[in-house]
Every structure is written in C-alpha cells, then in structure tokens.
C-alpha cells in the first residue's frame, strides 16, 4: 500500500501565545514533508491581515509550500484580488478559494454588490490572474446550502471547469461517505484523484459536535457512542487516535492518494495518526545543530 501525500490546515493566531503554538505545530508537522499547508480566512474576511502574516510566518520553514485561504464574503472584487496579489508578493503560489461563511448573525450568504457572486467566479478570476494552484472545497456530507447531494457534485464540477486544480473535502467520520461521494464525482466526469478527503482528529468531542452540526457533517451513532464511552473512562484521546487512524487507513486502502488534516493548530493527534500510518518525520537541520 503506497503512502499518501499529506496537507495540513492551520488558522491564524490571535496573540503571542497563539503564534508560539502555531510555530510548534507547523514545525512538527512540516517534518512529514506535506505537499502544502494552508491558513484559514475568517468569516467575512475578518482575519485578512492575520492570515497573510501567518502564511508568511509558515513560509519561512524550509521547503514548506503554503496556501492562503481566500473568500469572497463582504469584499469587492478589487479587494479580494488585492489579497491574492499580496499572497503572490509573499511568495505564495497556492490559494484555497472558497465562497466563505457570512459573518455571525447575518444568516445566509449575500454577495457584496461589487464582489464575486460565488466561488466559481472567484476561481475563474484567480486563474486569469496568473500562476496560482487553486484548491477548492468539497462536501461528502451535503453542504448546508445545497439542494441535494447531486447539486453538490454539479457545483464541484463547475469549480474544476473554472480552473480548480484540486478539492479538499469537509471533514467526515464514515469512509463510505467519502467513497460514495468520490464515485458520484467520477460518474460526473471529475477526476476523483484530485479530491483529497479531510480528516479532523478529535481533540475536543464537545466542540467537534458543534463543528459537525454547523457544517452538516453526519455523525455515525457508533462513533458518537464511542466518544461518549471513552470520555467517561478517561480514554478520549486514545479513542480519538484510533478513530482517526482507522479512518485514514481505510481511505488509503480505498485508493486515496492525498489526506488533508484539520489540525486546529495542534500537532499531537495529527502527528500520531501520521506515525500510525507509517509516515516518518524528517528532522530539521537547525534542530539537530
């Protein structure tokens, strides 16, 4: 069984302690030689400056390719593309292009009058700008705004037709959910090898339930019961490691070539899952000196 490529998602820190945590997590996971790491972009572009700062910070690690997230919420086309140009000026050649979530309390997505109406328009504009590698979102468990599962596939195909290079899925808990999604994508003419499943190692069960409810990720009853039992017995971390490793292992057995991890700026569980999959970390020369 071949080893998959890896990528890791981080979020921009808010304070000096957060920057130290990000640095430590990125350094630990960069040692696994990921294809890239990405930095998220807050709702409504609320972390625009912090995202760029974090991307520059991560870009200082040797050999690390960084992707900046970019959304079209609450900004004009000119403002959005100025962020893309800032990424390029900082040496970034990868962008995760998303519609984005509206600011809290706004309700549904409302395009800016002078902004991009959706992610497809954003992708096309980025492709026209220059030599960006564009990653997009995909949703094995139906996107909350999608009419049905077929609509998700239609929308994903439009993203690839607009110029996307790869898709990173929302996290999920049942590998069969991903395989069914992959099969539907392939049937629609999408190259399924360009879809990387997203894995969220569970660091906090209560928070993950909230995340799942917000993004529409289905929670299999047996997984929920397992976490609840493990929490009562004080074995939540061990169960989380076993659950994420089993999920990743099944995906790789099923032919997946790239795994995308949502790290929440903590290396521990993600690092241990990678090790359990047989990945070897390579020490940095500076760490050995």
Where are these regions (language model features)?
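Conserved N-terminal beta1-alpha1 strand-loop-helix module at the mouth
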Residues: 1-39
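Active-site beta-loop-alpha junctions enriched in small/polar residues
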Residues: 10-13, 40-44, 69-75, 100-101, ...
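Short, acidic/polar
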Residues: 16-29, 51, 77-84, 147-158, ...
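Active-site pocket-lining/capping segments in soluble small-molecule metabolic enzymes
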Residues: 17, 113-139, 188-246, 277-288
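Active-site-adjacent beta->alpha loops and helix N-cap segments on the catalytic face
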Residues: 17-19, 45-58, 76-82, 102-126, ...
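Conserved beta-strand positions in the central sheet of alpha/beta enzyme cores
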Residues: 38, 96-97, 135, 168, ...
């Amino acid at each position: 069984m071949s080893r998959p490529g890896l990528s890791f998602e981080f979020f921009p820190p808010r304070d000096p302690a957060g920057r130290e945590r990000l640095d430590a997590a990125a350094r630990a996971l960069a040692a696994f030689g990921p294809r890239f790491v990405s930095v998220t972009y807050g709702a409504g572009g609320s972390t625009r400056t912090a995202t760029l700062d974090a991307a520059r910070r991560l870009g200082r690690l040797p050999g690390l390719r960084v992707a900046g997230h970019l959304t079209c919420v609450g900004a004009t086309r000119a403002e959005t593309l100025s962020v893309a140009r800032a990424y390029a000026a900082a040496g970034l050649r990868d962008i995760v292009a998303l519609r984005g979530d509206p600011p809290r309390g706004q309700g549904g997505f409302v395009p800016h009058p002078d902004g991009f109406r959706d992610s497809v328009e954003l992708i096309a504009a980025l492709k026209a700008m220059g030599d960006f590698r564009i990653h997009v979102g995909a949703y094995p468990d139906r996107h909350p705004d999608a009419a049905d599962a077929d609509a998700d596939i239609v929308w994903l195909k439009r993203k690839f037709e607009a110029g996307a290079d790869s898709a990173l899925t929302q996290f999920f808990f049942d590998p069969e959910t991903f395989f069914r999604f992959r099969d539907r994508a392939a049937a629609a003419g999408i190259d399924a090898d360009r879809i990387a499943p997203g894995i969220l190692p569970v660091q906090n069960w209560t928070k993950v339930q909230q995340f799942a409810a917000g993004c529409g990720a289905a929670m299999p009853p047996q997984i929920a019961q397992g976490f609840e039992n493990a929490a009562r017995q004080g074995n939540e971390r061990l169960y989380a490691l076993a659950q994420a490793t089993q999920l990743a292992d099944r995906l790789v057995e099923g032919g997946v070539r790239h795994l995308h991890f949502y790290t929440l700026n903590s290396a521990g569980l993600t690092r241990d899952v990678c090790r359990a999959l047989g990945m070897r970390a390579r020490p940095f020369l500076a760490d050995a000196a």
